[in-house]
């Protein structure tokens, strides 16, 4: 992941709404309907395209559907979110989780393969069988903890960890 692109410095919001964001294909297999049906006083944004986009745009007019975004524009959506919601129960690895963490945005997700393999540190682990409870946990996570964790997962971060472990054993 590009930690220069996905960076908390891109955050530029003045509103006080709690913003939940989903990034990915708008498709049934992504379990996005669980995100769309989350109860609470949230502003929800869906970033992405897919076969269910038109249907969900019509069914959920209160939700902001912005379509496919890339590069700087995508990075801004991650940084501006208060919580990134990853509702999938079938993805094995979500790059979007890493991009969100690099942006300093905590992740709400189910405790399934993928999220549970990435969100291993207790300070950022918000996993729960209830997406709504996971969101509440994520709202308590410090953004700097997300960023710090993501920096450990870059090639540079992994190399530093490897070298520090190697030096211990010399």
Q: What does each of the following model-derived ranges do?
A:
Residues 168-170:
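Conserved small/polar residues in nucleotide/adenosyl-binding loops
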């Amino acid at each position: 992941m590009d930690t220069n692109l996905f960076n908390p410095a891109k955050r530029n919001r003045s509103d006080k709404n709690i913003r939940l964001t989903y990034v990915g294909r708008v498709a049934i297999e992504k379990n996005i309907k669980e995100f769309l049906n989350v109860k609470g006083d949230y502003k929800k944004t869906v970033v992405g395209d897919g076969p269910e986009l038109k249907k969900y745009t019509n069914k959920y007019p209160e939700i902001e559907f912005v379509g496919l975004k890339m590069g700087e524009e995508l990075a801004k959506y991650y940084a501006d979110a208060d919580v990134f919601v990853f509702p999938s129960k079938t993805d094995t690895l979500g790059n979007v989780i890493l991009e969100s963490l690099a942006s300093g945005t905590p992740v709400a997700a189910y405790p399934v393969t993928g999220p549970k393999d990435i969100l291993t540190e207790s300070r950022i682990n918000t996993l729960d069988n209830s997406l709504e409870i996971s969101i509440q946990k994520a709202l308590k996570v410090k953004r700097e903890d997300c960023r710090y964790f993501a920096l450990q997962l870059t090639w540079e971060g992994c190399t530093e960890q490897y070298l520090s472990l190697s030096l211990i054993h010399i």
